[in-house]
Amino acid sequence: MKELWSPQNRYQKWLEIEILACEAWAELGKIPASAVETIKKKASFDLQRIAEIEEVTKHDVIAFLSCVAESVGDEGKFLHMGLTSYDVVDTALSLLMRDALEIILEALEKLLKLLQEKALAYKDTVMIGRTHGVHAEPITLGLKFALWYCELQRARQRLERAKEVISVGRLSGAVGTYAHIDPYVEAYVCRKLGLKPAKISTQVLQRDRHAEYLNALAVTAASLEKFAVEIRHLQRTEVLEVEESFAQGQKGSSAMPHKRNPITCERLTGLARVVRGNALAALENIALWHERDISHSSVERIIIPDSTTLLHYMIVKFTEILQGLQVYPARMEKNLQLTKGLIFSQRLLLALVEKGLLREEAYALVQRLALQAWPEGDFRDLVKGDPEIGSYLSAAEIDALFDYRPYLENVDYIFWKAGLSDPPVAKWEQKARVRLVSPKRSGEKRELVYEGKAKKVYKTSDPDLYLVEFKDQATAFDGMKKEEIPGKGRLNNLISAYLFALLECAGVATHFVSLVSETEMLVRAVEVLPLEVIVRNLVAGSMAKRLGMPEGRELSRPLVSFCYKSDQLHDPLLTEEEIIALELVTPDQLTALKEISLKCNQVLRTYFQSKGILLVDFKLEFGFDHQGELLLVDEISPDTCRLWDLETGEKLDKDRFRRDLGDLISGYQKVWQRMQGGEG
C-alpha cells in the first residue's frame, strides 16, 4: 500500500495516461505515429526535477509535464494535447483507488477465512450473552464469530460496490464538453486502463463517488472497531473470557508489571475514528463550485491515501489478533453461574404461561423472585420454594428449565443461514414428520377446477384452500407415452408433502397445508406463475442431449434456468432478459425465484445425500397467494426430480418410465423408504 501511494507510482500513472492519449490521437491521425513511438521510448521523469520545477510553477501537473517533455525532446509538444490537468489526475486517482481496494479486499478475504474457521471451532463453546452490558441468555463464542463473518461479508459487498463506482475515468476537457479533445481519446484511454468513461463530468469526476468510497472504508473500519471493542470488554479482569496474545518480553505498563492490556484492539478503536472523520471530509468535498474548484484536492491528498492505508493496516492487525486470541472456556462457564440461575428467567416465564397463567401474572411472579435473587441467593432455590409456582410446576419440571441446551438448539440453523455449514436437515426431519401426522385439516371437496397429467385440483368450502389429488397416471414426451401405474400418486403425494414440510423448516414458504389422505393434500390457493425453474447440479437429460455431453458431469456450481410453461411449445427455455422484457415477473421477483430455488437445492441436495441419493436436477413452480406472498407450489417428487443412487448410479426417478429402465414404482418406493429411514 505504501508503494501504491508513493509519488513515483502516482507520476507513473500520469505518464501512462499521457502516452495512451497520444496513442489515441495517433489513431485519429492527429499525431504522427513516429512521434508516439518516440514518446513511448524516451518519456521518463525524475522526482527531484519535478520538485524543482514545481517550486517555480506552483503546479504539480505542469511540473510533471515539463519534466517529461525535457526527456522526450521536440516530440514532447504532443503531450497533454487537448487535455486539462484533471483529465490526468482524476483518471489516475481512480486507478490508484481501485488498486488500493484490491489490496484491501485481498486482506479481507484472509480475515473472512479465519473468522469462518474460528466460528466453526467455537460453535458449541457456551458463554453468556449480554444486553446493555448485563447477563441475558446463553449464546456461543462461535455465534459471535459468525456474526462478525456475516458483517464483513456485507463490508466486502460495499467495498466491491465502491470499486465499481470509482473505476471510472474522464478525459473531457476543462468543463467536460470535449471542446478540444475527441471523445474517442477518452474511450480509448479508459478501455486500456480497465475503466469506464464517466457518462458526464465537469472538470472533475463528481465527488459523490469518492464519498461513497470513503464511507465504505469507514463502515468497514467501524465494524473492525466493534469487534475490537467486544474483545476489550471480554478481556476486562472481571470477565476475562478472551484475551489478546501477550508476547514474550512484552510490557503492559511502565509502572505496573502485572498489566496485560488489549493494546492492539485499543489501537484499532482509535484508528477507526480517524477513518470515520475522513469519510466526513469526503462528504464535504461533494459540493464544489460550478464546474469545479480546487477545495477538494488538498483534502483528498490526505484522506484517500491515509484511509486506504489505515483500513488495510486494521484488517491485517485484526487478523493477527484473531490468530493469537486466547479463549478461556472455564471462565465462560464460571461467568454463566454468576447470576445464580437468573439467565433462565424467560424459560420459567414461558413455562408458567403454558400452564395457564396470564403473561402479566407470570411476568410479575418471575420478576419478584428474580429481584429477590440478586441480593439474596440462588434463583432456582427461590423458584422451588415458592408455593405459587409449585402449584403449576413440579420440582423436576423446574430443574429441566435450568438447562443451557434449549438455548442452543438452533445454532446449526444459524450457521447454515450464515453460510458457514450445511443445512441441519437431520434436526428438521422430525419436525417434518410431525407435520405429516398432525391433525388433518379438511375442506369439503367441491368443483374440479383443473386436471393435469399428474394431478386434479378441487375447490373446497374454504376459498383460500384447494385440495390436490395425485393421480396414478404416468406420462412422457408431451403425453405421447402414457400408463396407469397403481401407487404412483400415493408415493408422489407423500414424498411431496414431506419435502414441503422439510423446506418450511428451512424458511421456504410453500402452499402445503396438510395431508388429507395418502393421495390428497390440502394447499393454499395461489395464482401460479407461467414459469418453471430448473436447478441442475449435474449434466443430464435435455442439457446432456443439447450439449452432446455424457450424463453425470458435475457442474462447478448449481445452474438455475427457466422455462415458459406451455405443453404446445414443449416448455421452451427463457433467458432472464426475456422474462423481464415480457413482464412475466419483476426483476425483484426474478431474484427471489433464483434465491429460493438455490436455497431449496442446498437443503434438498444435503437431505438426499444423507439418504444415499444424488439430486441431479429438479424443477420447481411458484405462485402468489391472495396476500402477494411468493410460495413454492406444485410438487417435489421423483416425477420432478432426477434422483440417482449415490453408490450405484441407479436411476430412481421418472427416467425409469421415460427410458424403460425398469419398474417405476420400485424406484419411487426406494426413495420413500430411504426417506423413512429404511435401506430402500
Task: For the regions a language model picked out, list residue spans one by one.
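A short glycine-rich, hydrophobically flanked beta-strand micro-motif that places a catalytic Asp/Glu
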Residues: 513-519, 608-623
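A long amphipathic alpha-helix within ATP-dependent nucleotide-binding catalytic cores
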Residues: 585-616
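Conserved metal-phosphate-binding beta-hairpin within the catalytic cores
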Residues: 535, 615-634
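Glycine-rich anion/phosphate-binding loop at the beta-strand->alpha-helix junction
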Residues: 155, 159, 203-296, 301
